[in-house]
């Protein structure tokens, strides 16, 4: 079994990224004293797959898949619906999007699944993590109610391939996420 995985992330454009980083910093201020906290660049995970440890071309294949995705997809706007906290470390404090986000991103998932050698049963759940925290759930739920929700849709213009441990169990696993490639989505001029 592979110890590493590759995830494909949808990344915000500069304006949305600045706003999301401000919200993430605000969330971190509100929870830092209650437990460990870790942040990653704002992103929506589109798909995750095993990275073949014994195949030296595995990362190159992931980058090729990313290029294929970027060449066939255009920038997309997603509408924030709510902030919520869960017991899962990987969804400590997240921004949920409206129902149209799943419909909009399903073809992206299908494209990535089709080019995968192994079907992992990945379930698309469009959300954006503001932070990852070991703080008590009740405190994170309280914080989710205090953060101002953006009123306007957020524009996502880039995608990236990120390697990380195949199982995320602690903040060190989150911090180990490493971008191997990033590119702009197709945008006809």
Question: Where do the protein language model's features map onto the residues?
Answer:
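Short, basic/glycine-rich phosphate-binding loops at helix/coil junctions
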Residues: 86-94
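A short acidic, often aromatic-flanked loop/helix-cap motif at beta-alpha or helix-coil junctions
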Residues: 85-86, 169
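Substrate/cofactor-recognition hotspot
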Residues: 81
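Basic, often amphipathic N-terminal segments
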Residues: 1-78, 99-160, 170-189
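Active-site/acyl-donor-binding loops of N-acyltransferases
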Residues: 162-165
């Amino acid at each position: 079994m592979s110890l590493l995985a590759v995830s494909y992330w949808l990344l915000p454009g500069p304006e949305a990224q600045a706003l999301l980083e401000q919200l993430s910093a605000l969330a971190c201020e509100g929870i830092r004293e209650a437990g460990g906290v870790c942040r990653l660049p704002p992103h929506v995970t589109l798909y995750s797959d095993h990275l073949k440890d014994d195949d030296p071309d595995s990362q190159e294949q992931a980058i090729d898949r990313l290029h294929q995705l970027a060449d066939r997809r255009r920038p997309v706007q997603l509408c924030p619906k709510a902030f919520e906290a869960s017991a899962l470390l990987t969804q400590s404090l997240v921004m949920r999007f409206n129902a149209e986000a799943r419909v909009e991103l399903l073809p992206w998932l299908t494209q990535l699944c089709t080019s995968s050698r192994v079907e992992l049963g990945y379930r698309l759940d469009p959300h954006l993590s503001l932070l990852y925290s070991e703080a008590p759930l009740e405190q994170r739920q309280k914080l989710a109610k205090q953060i101002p929700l953006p009123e306007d849709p957020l524009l996502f213009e880039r995608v990236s391939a990120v390697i990380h441990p195949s199982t995320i169990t602690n903040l060190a696993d989150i911090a180990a996420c490493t971008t191997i490639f990033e590119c702009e989505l197709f945008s006809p001029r």
